[in-house]
């Protein structure tokens, strides 16, 4: 059984959040929106604030999930992160931009059960 793309993406974000928690991250916010843009996960890794983009794919037949984080997408994430920092986080802090790729390997009753995770820290930088 396969999933519709929206469900797959949501379940991939849930899997990424759980994976980050297991690695010791503290989730600050999920699905932070600013105007038309969104950051999937905002988390603390020790004393670093991480803006995490999650890309989930059912297969890599049409490309690896990391390929979907284009330069344009990076600009949108950076713009949204700046808005978050200005409006909601009023102290100076180290930040970074990470990408988590989730590749589905198995489903059970319409739920993502098995998957591979690839976490790229400092995947891109703000200029």
UniProtKB/Swiss-Prot annotation:
Pfam families hit by this protein: UPF0102
CDD domains: PoNe_Nuclease (cd20736)
MF GO annotations: nucleic acid binding
Superkingdom assignment: Bacteria
Family to which this protein belongs: Belongs to the UPF0102 family.
PANTHER family: UPF0102 PROTEIN YRAN
The protein's name: UPF0102 protein Paes_0016
Provenance organism: Prosthecochloris aestuarii (strain DSM 271 / SK 413)
């Amino acid at each position: 059984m396969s999933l519709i793309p929206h469900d797959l993406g949501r379940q991939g974000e849930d899997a990424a959040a759980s994976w980050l928690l297991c690695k010791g991250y503290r989730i600050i916010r999920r699905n932070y929106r600013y105007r038309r843009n969104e950051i999937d996960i905002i988390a603390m890794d020790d004393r670093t604030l991480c803006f995490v983009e999650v890309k989930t794919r059912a297969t890599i037949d049409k490309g690896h999930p990391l390929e979907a984080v284009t330069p344009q997408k990076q600009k949108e994430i950076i713009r949204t992160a700046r808005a978050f920092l200005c409006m909601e986080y009023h102290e100076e802090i180290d930040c970074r931009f990470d990408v988590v790729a989730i590749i589905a390997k198995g489903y059970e009753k319409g739920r993502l059960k098995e998957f591979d995770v690839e976490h790229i820290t400092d995947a891109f930088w703000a200029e």
